[in-house]
A protein has these predicted regions:
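Residues that form or flank phosphate/diphosphate-binding pockets in enzymes
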Residues: 12, 38-39, 64, 184, ...
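Proline-centered turn/helix-capping motifs that create local helix->coil transitions or kinks
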Residues: 120, 129-133, 168, 184, ...
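Short aromatic-enriched loop/helix-cap "lid" or pocket-rim segments at secondary-structure transitions
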Residues: 41-44, 131-134, 184-187, 251-252, ...
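Hydrophobic alpha-helix immediately C-terminal to the catalytic Tyr-X-X-X-Lys motif of short-chain
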Residues: 155, 159, 163, 193, ...
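C-terminal substrate-binding subdomain of Rossmann-fold SDR/epimerase-dehydratase oxidoreductases
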Residues: 4, 16, 58, 191, ...
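The catalytic Tyr-centered alpha-helix of NAD(P)H-dependent dehydrogenases
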Residues: 145-152, 176, 182, 186, ...
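N-terminal Rossmann-like NAD(P)+-binding domain of SDR-like oxidoreductases, especially those catalyzing
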Residues: 1-179, 304, 309-312, 318-341
């Protein structure tokens, strides 16, 4: 297979590329990535010498560059390219509209023109909004995005569906719960808490910390993407989840326990505007139709994740250089504190 991956220098994209090259020996991958703040070439440095892997720096909104890339001929595209952090979308919604909506449409148009055999679009559970206690969203749930980020991803999903229905683009949408694992940018909850705890810095927790998220180890998600790529049904949406939502506070306490750090490091800060209370997905469709199920328990996954960050301090230091500290101070250091753990 000749595979185009957009946004492959980010967290899930880089893990996916590594997973495919390790498990699909006959696959060639071109990674097309703009290398924004969260796109880290260090995440794929060990693959630079692999003849099956190629990298081109570029913007999915650059229609000429995208058209030129498509001339190489691909069997499929997996689109990870996106702005993904909710806090940043609250500050700058226009960037999310430009990248996540306009950029996706640009890729869809190129795929239509090239008659691409397969287009897999990576979406998010956040398009559904906040799930009531005891309920789980199915693929038929009406979308109800609550943040600019979620709205941009929901809009992109609608464009993917529209191109499939109107132009016959062979597209599939994947909506997954929160991922965690190696190479995740430290603005996200789990790597942020690991990094701060290791340095005995305060661990900022939004509101009461009881927001529930369903955490899936990134390796399990990569397997789901490969299955969808190879066996998924065109035009379908597949939810992907571990099926066991946990409060953020429980996650933070688990990290502190693994690191042998006190809960007094926890610091409760003013909650995010419009913060969804709970995400939960029903993933029975992909389990039933494609035979997927998670293989890594949260206990194993969080241990592997913590060990990876502790063993890769140089990668973490690189990720936290540049504008990261300014962002961190704006969102956490200068955010009003409610009380400490």
């Amino acid at each position: 297979m000749n595979l185009l991956v957009t946004g492959g220098a980010g967290f899930i994209g880089s893990n996916f590329i590594r997973h495919v090259l390790l498990t699909r020996g006959d696959t060639r991958i071109l990674n097309f990535d703009k290398l924004t703040y969260a796109g880290n070439p260090e995440s794929l440095r060990d693959l630079a010498a692999d003849p099956r892997y190629d990298f081109v720096r570029g913007d999915i909104n650059d229609r000429a560059a995208v058209a030129d890339i498509f001339k190489r001929g691909f069997d499929a595209l997996v689109n990870f390219a996106a702005e993904t952090h909710v806090d940043r979308s609250i500050e700058d919604a226009a960037t999310f509209l430009h990248t996540n909506v306009s950029g996706t449409q640009c890729l869809l148009e190129a795929a239509r023109a090239a008659r691409l055999p397969r287009f897999v679009h990576i979406s998010t559970d956040e398009v559904y909004g906040s799930a009531p206690a005891g309920s789980s969203f199915t693929e038929e749930t009406v979308l109800d995005p609550r943040s600019p980020y979620a709205a941009s991803k929901a809009s992109a999903d609608h464009f993917v569906s529209a191109y499939a229905n109107t132009y016959g683009v062979s597209a599939i949408i994947l909506r997954c719960t929160n991922n965690y694992g190696p190479f995740q940018f430290p603005e996200k909850l789990i790597p942020l808490m690991i990094a701060n705890a290791q340095e005995d810095k305060p661990l900022p927790i939004y509101g009461d910390g009881l927001q529930e998220r369903d955490w899936l180890f990134v390796e399990d998600y990569c397997r789901a993407i490969v299955l969808t790529l190879e066996s998924g049904t065109t035009g379908e949406v597949y939810n992907v989840s571990a099926g066991s939502p946990q409060p953020n506070l429980t996650i933070v306490k688990t990290i502190l326990k693994h690191l042998g750090k006190p809960e007094s490091l926890m610091q409760y800060v003013k909650d995010r505007p419009g913060h969804d209370r709970r995400y939960a997905l029903d993933s029975s469709k992909i389990r039933r139709q494609l035979g997927w199920k998670p293989q890594v328990s949260f206990e194993e996954g969080i241990r592997r994740t913590i060990d990876w960050y502790l063993s890769n301090s140089a990668w973490l230091d690189h990720a936290r250089s540049g504008e990261y500290q300014t962002y961190y101070d704006r969102h956490y250091t200068n955010r009003s504190t409610t009380f400490s753990g």
